[in-house]
A protein has these predicted regions:
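Active-site neighborhoods and metal-handling regions in enzymes and metal-associated proteins
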Residues: 1-241
Length: 241
């Protein structure tokens, strides 16, 4: 019963989630601008934690994936350090008075992206847009995942959850917990309703090379989905305004 009630957020709850999202986005931008050659994931993570503390958020940890490690949604056990031309993926959370934000940014360090890096980044960016277009009040939550996945398959990824492609759900519910019902995953029949909150993170992963994940959370309104944070516009401006 409690979980059912928590699926729908009140205006006060949405305001706390907005505050957490604003802090999280600013902290990722801060860390990205201060990332240097040779840095470890732990050093980048420390930059994010420092920024969050300064801005008034509670840092709940993050996942920093560099180079080939970004090709696996949850990373690898190999040690990696930042090098020019490599992907840096930062997937981190923040809470304000117990309400969560979850944002991922992916950028190329120290140089122009390759044509393949740019293509995949643009495809994930498009995937976020497809998810938002599919997220309509009353439709099954799983239909959002289906819309993204069908497009990715038309681009040659998959099929379904196979790599290269997207091996995880398009999004998860978020609120007092980072991961809570309902999920944007194939087969989920729960209809979308105003006040529901989700991540939007249709990453693409190419084993042995790299991955790109862009993640912004949104909430459903009477007229459709609304982002808490604006997705960055391009790989050349990977943190946005």
């Amino acid at each position: 019963v409690v979980r059912q009630l928590r699926m729908i957020k009140s205006p006060a709850e949405l305001a706390l989630m907005q505050a957490a999202a604003d802090i999280m986005a600013a902290s990722l931008r801060y860390a990205g601008e201060r990332t240097r050659d040779g840095m470890t994931p732990e050093q980048i993570d420390a930059l994010i934690a420092s920024a969050q503390k300064t801005l008034g958020g509670s840092y709940d940890g993050g996942l920093i994936l560099i180079g080939e490690a970004s090709a696996y949604p949850h990373g690898s056990h190999k040690p990696h350090v930042v090098r020019k031309g490599e992907i840096v993926l930062m997937d981190c959370t923040c809470s304000v008075h117990g309400y969560q934000a979850d944002i991922t940014r992916t950028f190329v360090f120290g140089g122009a992206p390759t044509s393949e890096q740019r293509k995949v980044w643009d495809q994930v960016h498009r995937g976020q847009q497809i998810a938002m277009a599919a997220a309509k009040v009353g439709v099954p939550a799983g239909s959002v995942d289906d819309a993204v996945r069908s497009t990715y398959e038309s681009w040659g990824y998959g099929p379904r959850y196979k790599l290269p492609g997207t091996s995880h759900r398009t999004g998860h519910g978020i609120g007092m917990e980072v991961h809570e019902p309902v999920n944007l995953v194939h087969g989920e029949a729960t209809p979308l309703a105003p006040g529901m909150c989700f991540s939007n993170e249709p990453g693409i992963y190419i084993p042995g090379k790299f991955g790109v994940r862009l993640e912004d959370c949104f909430h459903m309104t009477e007229t459709g989905p609304k982002f808490f944070t604006t997705p960055p516009p391009s790989i050349d401006d990977p943190f946005g305004a």
